[in-house]
């Protein structure tokens, strides 16, 4: 017989709900008789974000696809503690224009399409405008970027709603680096689950990177993991430059 369907975040989500119920009891909150109420905007954002980014692998997938959409010929994946402390994807693509930076991590903001009919002409991976917004909600998100027309780069840090909390000049080459620190930090149970499964999560991330490297063989990929004791593990390095991919 086929195994019943199971979703990766199901167990942590159940545990989160159990904790919520416990807090209600200990805080002395009374039952309101089942009255239907509007969910707060903050709660909706956190719930939806948890479905877009379910693990480190899905976060990495979204960031690699953003880099490919930017026309990158080089993509560097940098991890700290197998991605538990930090996941960073840097590329040498076209960068994020100044006019687009304020909305780059806002929900349903995208440079890929404006109207539904644009889907017929879409030639990119991402288009929903949800990934970066979800990462801003689930982690500490920062982006450094520069276009060929910029005199200098910019380092953007984001609030939980995806708005730019701070922007500062930074020296860097043309391209973009997206840093995701402390993924699932606002969700203690999910965070502990990630820490316990760090090695398996790393294997899945590496397999994802290898898949894109095989398909997009014109792009040079590297994946480096930095350990707590100062060790540095080069997990993947490809030559790129082949004509068949991309």
Predicted features by range, described:
Residues 5-65, 69:
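Bergerat-fold GHKL ATPase/HATPase_c domain
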Residues 17-24, 59-121, 134:
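Conserved beta-strand-loop-beta-strand hairpin that lines the nucleotide-binding pocket
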Residues 40, 53-57, 70-73, 82-84, ...:
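Short loop/turn elements that form and flank the Walker-type P-loop nucleotide-binding site
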Residues 1-2:
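Low-complexity, disordered terminal segments
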Residues 118-246:
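Glycine/threonine-rich ATP-lid/beta-loop region of ATP-binding domains
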Residues 44, 48, 102-106, 184:
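Conserved protein kinase catalytic domain
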């Amino acid at each position: 017989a086929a195994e019943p369907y199971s979703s990766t975040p199901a167990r942590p989500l159940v545990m989160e709900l159990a904790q919520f119920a416990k807090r209600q009891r200990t805080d002395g909150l009374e039952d309101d008789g089942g009255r239907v109420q509007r969910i707060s905007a903050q709660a909706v954002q956190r719930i939806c974000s948890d479905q877009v980014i379910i693990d480190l692998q899905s976060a990495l997938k979204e960031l690699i696809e953003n880099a490919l959409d930017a026309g990158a010929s080089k993509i560097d994946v940098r991890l700290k503690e197998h991605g538990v402390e930090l996941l960073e994807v840097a590329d040498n693509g076209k960068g994020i224009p100044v006019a687009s930076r304020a909305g780059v991590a806002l929900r349903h903001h995208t440079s890929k399409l404006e109207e539904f009919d644009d889907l017929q002409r879409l030639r990119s991976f991402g288009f929903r405008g949800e990934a970066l917004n979800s990462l801003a909600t689930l982690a500490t998100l920062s982006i450094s970027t520069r276009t060929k027309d910029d005199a200098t780069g910019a380092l953007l840090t984001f609030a939980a709603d995806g708005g730019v909390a701070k922007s500062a000049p930074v020296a860097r080459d043309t391209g973009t680096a997206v840093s995701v620190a402390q993924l699932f930090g606002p969700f203690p149970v999910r965070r502990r689950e990630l820490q316990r499964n760090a090695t398996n999560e790393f294997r899945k991330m590496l397999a994802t990177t290898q898949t894109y490297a095989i398909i997009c063989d014109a792009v040079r990929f590297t994946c480096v993991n930095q350990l707590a004791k100062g060790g540095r593990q080069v997990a993947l390095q490809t030559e790129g430059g082949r004509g068949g991919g991309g």
